[in-house]
Design a protein with these regions (language model features):
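Glycine-rich FAD pyrophosphate-binding loop
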Residues: 157-161, 170-193
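A conserved beta-strand/loop capping segment in the N-terminal third of enzymes
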Residues: 200-262, 284-287, 294
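C-terminal helical "tail/cap" subdomain of flavin- and related membrane-associated enzymes
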Residues: 109-113, 117-126, 410, 466-619
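Short, low-complexity, Lys/Arg-enriched N-terminal segments of secretory-pathway carbohydrate enzymes
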Residues: 1-100, 129-139
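Predominantly flavin-linked oxidoreductase catalytic cores and closely associated redox partners
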Residues: 147-151, 264-401
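A short, basic/flexible loop-to-alpha-helix module at the beginning of a structural domain
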Residues: 119-153, 298, 441
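FAD/FMN-dependent oxidoreductases across multiple families
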Residues: 381-488
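Beta1/beta-strand and adjacent pyrophosphate-binding region of the FAD-binding site
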Residues: 144-164, 180
């Protein structure tokens, strides 16, 4: 192998020693080219007379500590035993791999630096993508795919196609989900409730793109309420000034409304609407994988999807698998249809504070008025079959309705087209289950006096849609379940306000022999008669336009304080003072148990619940 020589020279002017490479080195050896080209000065470490000392011994001392004493280099003394020659040079033969290492050390450093930045950029990009896709919920790159062991190709199974189920199917399908809806009966429903949609619910309908479902079904605009008590009446209008002219409540035939939403959902190519009866949820290791159902031909089938949403209504047979239901039946509704009846206030719902409980009237078409007579739970429900119901309606209820409605009411009773249904109340008590979630009346119910059920259901759908929208994949059921716990917290302020108002108003509006309760009922009517914020505030709560818990509590106790003030003026007496105390304690006894069942913390301080912040990872 050809020897490589290091040469040292003294510059004649600067007396500095320069080091340059021997021709044996590669012309591309950048480090030495750099020195040779610019002749960078190196401080002399030995004189020319001692250049012979820069021999194999010194090279060994420089190389061995770094590379070890091995066969990678061979140093030979070329002095031929001639010690008198001071300019003799030591030729050090170095293996090519050592030369290559020295030659590319700078290039290696630059390449390593560039590689580090490339890897950092890739890692950061993946992390940002992961955050955008749901804070770790998305585990695969398949967009909206279903991984269930069966090639069903379905992302979401919706059990039930009522108001909640049909609206939910349409909403999720618009976001690209493949939805399989299983409904027990696809014929047009015929119900006596779910016929009044408050303005707040109509706004949610607009937000979901379903507002046209109230068109072409002869739906009637509702702009407020008329309240009647002991021959007196007041008109309460919705505070709609800040909204467009189209925003108002709507009243209609429930079945027509549901059929329109079913048709709209089924018109989407990624929605499969099937008639069948779901008998059970399919679970595997605590995770719901799908449902077992019977189709219209009686065949037992199974359907699989990463997420199953149960919306099978107030008579749900699946809710016990997903929550701890505490269903109460505070009363029954007796339903009638009055034909060609002119109500005292056009485009208003009508509430009569009758004895023993309220009576409702509202238009459901241009020629029909729905009448709902409440029969409290403590009273035996008269039988329709033996004529007791007709007798009760004529003798007890008819004398209390407004004169304008009396004849139409009696005529409707005579037709004997009377129907009843239980009014159910159930606070939301979810048991988060991987792979499944409850919605609608299967999940949460309140007394239908205020007509807030559809508003709550549609509001819940908007919240769930917003939570699911950023997620491309739903197959990690456990992670998804943990993430969707935020749904139960986010819905609380709106849902709990409407639920509490419904329960509290029903108890206040019912007649009672208790003097304190009578004063509370009278105070409520007179408080609403004051107008201004005393009427706008409660009506905004009732309409779902301002469902704020603090506003509800403020107005409820303002009514109680107003009632106490009336008792103490002009001159308080011990008897009236005691009655005022009972009125306040009675008011607290009405509202606090309802709020406790709903959950004080979630209702008033949702931001203190850890699950509340899980949604922020995606937002």
């Amino acid at each position: 192998m050809k020897g490589c020589h290091y040469h040292s020279h003294n510059h004649p002017t600067h007396q500095h020693q320069y080091l340059y490479k021997s021709p044996c080195f590669s012309p591309n050896f950048s480090f030495f080219n750099f020195l040779h080209k610019f002749k960078l000065p190196l401080k002399p470490r030995f004189s020319s007379s001692s250049s012979s000392s820069f021999n194999s011994i010194h090279l060994r001392q420089l190389i061995v500590p770094k590379f070890g004493e091995n066969n990678k280099f061979v140093c030979n003394n070329n002095n031929n035993n001639n010690n008198n020659n001071n300019n003799s040079n030591s030729n050090c033969m170095i293996m090519m791999n050592l030369v290559v290492i020295d030659e590319y050390i700078v290039a290696f450093f630059v390449a390593s630096l560039l590689g580090f930045f490339v890897l950092f950029s890739v890692f950061r990009g993946r992390k940002l993508k992961k955050d955008e896709d749901g804070g770790g919920v998305v585990l695969t790159e398949d967009v909206r795919s279903s991984d269930d062991g069966v090639s069903s190709g379905i992302d979401v199974i919706v059990v039930g196609a009522g108001v909640a189920g049909a609206a939910l199917a349409h909403t999720l399908a618009k976001d690209g989900r493949r939805v399989h809806v299983i409904e027990r009966d696809l014929t047009e429903p015929d119900r006596i409730v779910g016929e009044l949609l408050q303005p707040g619910g109509y706004l949610k309908l607009i937000e979901l793109g379903l507002e046209d479902c109230v068109g072409d079904i002869d739906a009637q605009r509702v702009v407020g309420y008329g309240l009647f008590k002991d021959g007196k009446n007041i008109r309460l209008s919705y505070p709609l000034e800040q909204f467009s002219t189209d925003v108002a409540g709507r009243s209609f035939h429930n079945g027509r409304f549901i059929q329109r939403m079913r048709e709209k959902a089924a018109s989407l190519p990624n929605v499969r609407l099937e008639q069948g009866t779901v008998t059970s949820l399919l679970e595997e290791k605590g995770v719901v994988k799908g449902v077992q159902y019977k189709n219209r031909n009686g065949e037992e089938l199974k359907a699989y999807a990463p997420l199953t949403i149960v919306c099978d209504g107030c008579f749900s047979n699946l809710r016990r698998s997903l929550c701890s239901p505490k269903v109460e039946v505070p009363s029954h509704f007796v339903g009638l249809i009055l034909e060609n009846c002119q109500l005292p206030f056009s485009n208003h719902g009508h509430v009569i504070l009758a004895d023993p409980s309220p009576i409702l009237f509202y238009q459901i078409s241009s020629t029909e008025v729905r009448c709902l007579v409440d029969v409290p739970a403590g009273q035996k429900l008269p039988s329709i079959a033996n004529g007791e119901m007709a007798k009760y309606l004529k003798s007890v209820v008819a004398p209390q309705v407004p004169p304008e409605i009396y004849e139409s009411f009696v005529a409707a009773v005579d037709k004997c087209n009377i129907r009843t249904m239980p009014n159910r109340s159930m606070p939301a008590t979810p048991q988060p289950t991987p792979g499944a979630i409850l919605m609608g009346d299967a999940f949460n119910m309140r007394h239908p006096l205020t007509g807030g059920g559809m508003t709550v259901a549609l509001s819940d759908i908007v919240i769930l849609r917003d939570l699911l929208r950023p997620l491309k994949d739903l197959t990690n059921s456990k992670a998804l379940c943990q993430y969707l716990e935020s749904f139960y917290t986010l819905r609380k302020p709106v849902a709990s306000t409407i639920n509490t108002l419904a329960g509290a108003l029903y108890k206040v509006f019912c007649a009672s022999s208790d003097d304190a309760h009578k004063e509370m009922r009278e105070a409520c009517f007179d408080y609403l008669s004051l107008g201004g914020e005393c009427s706008n505030g409660p009506v905004a709560l009732l309409s779902g336009l301002n469902p704020r818990p603090l506003s509800l509590v403020a107005h409820f106790f303002a009514v109680a304080v107003y009632g106490v003030g009336r008792l103490l003026l002009p001159f308080p007496s011990p008897q009236r003072l005691w009655l005022g105390v009972r009125l306040l304690t009675g008011a607290a006894g009405i509202i606090f148990p309802i709020m406790k069942a709903e959950g004080f913390r979630q209702m008033f301080f949702p931001a203190t619940v850890p699950a509340y912040y899980r949604s922020l990872q995606v937002r």
